[in-house]
């Protein structure tokens, strides 16, 4: 199993950043190596990206189009970021691949597909905490929009997630706006209906609809993880290569004698050893 020195160096940089993120500390945001420093107006797309799919890329492309339209309207240029959290709300049970590998994979993908986009890393999973982290870490950010699918806005507006929903939403929308794309059968009309409810109307002006091609609305990272062979057309080439080379989503390989080899577990051990050795040499 070969890992280039360039990859080791990038992994080391990412690992150093991850070690700075403490889930028990106040909200933190860090910018990944090679990413532009956030300033002005930014769009942030938080996700687990496990793995990145063609839907993720299509959504980023649509957000880039939104940013260009905003610039034409005189709002100024907008920076685009994908974001991962060291603490993913409601997704803690998904363990592989390593967050380190996911960051590296996402970085490779963005460098080729969206060279002007960046990656942010958070220590918290809630949108309001991530918004606090952005404004604290990057005070030159004037306007923050979170990019998300329709299922997320339903959760955000659901009173069952809060002790005091309206107070929590006021805290969120004092710091950020939301850019919402259709998901599944829930399109722009569904979002309009949701925002027209009396309890949601006070917050409607902070929530913007992002048109999204229906061809991508049903694509799911979960389906790709569980049934990759059935969803090859939904997986970017760079991701297919990562999956093939690391077997991060594949079960252990069973040999004729009954023994099993977990190739991704071997990769994890190798990376831990390499990073430990590099750290000791400093």
Model regions and ranges:
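Nucleotidyltransferase catalytic core that binds NTPs
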Residues: 1-282
């Amino acid at each position: 199993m070969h890992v280039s020195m360039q990859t080791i160096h990038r992994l080391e940089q990412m690992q150093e950043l991850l070690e700075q993120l403490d889930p028990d500390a106040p909200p933190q945001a860090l910018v990944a190596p090679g990413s532009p420093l956030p300033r002005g107006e930014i769009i942030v797309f938080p996700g687990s990206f496990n793995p990145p799919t063609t839907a993720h890329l299509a959504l980023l492309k649509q957000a880039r189009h939104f940013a260009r339209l905003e610039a034409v309207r005189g709002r100024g240029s907008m920076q685009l970021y994908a974001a991962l959290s060291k603490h993913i709300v409601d997704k803690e049970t998904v363990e592989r691949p390593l967050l380190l590998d996911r960051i590296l994979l996402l970085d490779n993908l963005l460098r080729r597909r969206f060279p002007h986009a960046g990656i942010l890393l958070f220590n918290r999973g809630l949108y309001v905490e991530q918004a606090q982290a952005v404004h604290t870490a990057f005070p030159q950010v004037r306007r923050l929009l979170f990019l998300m699918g329709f299922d997320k806005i339903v959760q955000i507006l659901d009173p069952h997630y809060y002790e005091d929903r309206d107070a929590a939403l006021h805290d969120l929308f004092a710091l950020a706006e939301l850019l919402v794309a259709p998901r599944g059968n829930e399109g722009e009309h569904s979002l309009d209906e949701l925002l027209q409810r009396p309890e949601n109307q006070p917050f409607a002006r902070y929530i913007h609809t992002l048109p999204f091609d229906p061809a991508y609305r049903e694509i799911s990272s979960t389906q790709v993880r569980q049934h990759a062979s059935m969803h090859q057309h939904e997986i970017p080439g760079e991701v297919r290569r990562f999956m093939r080379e690391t077997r991060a989503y594949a079960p252990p390989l069973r040999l004729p004698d009954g023994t099993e080899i977990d190739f991704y577990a071997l990769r994890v051990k190798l990376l831990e050893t390499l990073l430990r050795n590099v750290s000791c040499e400093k």
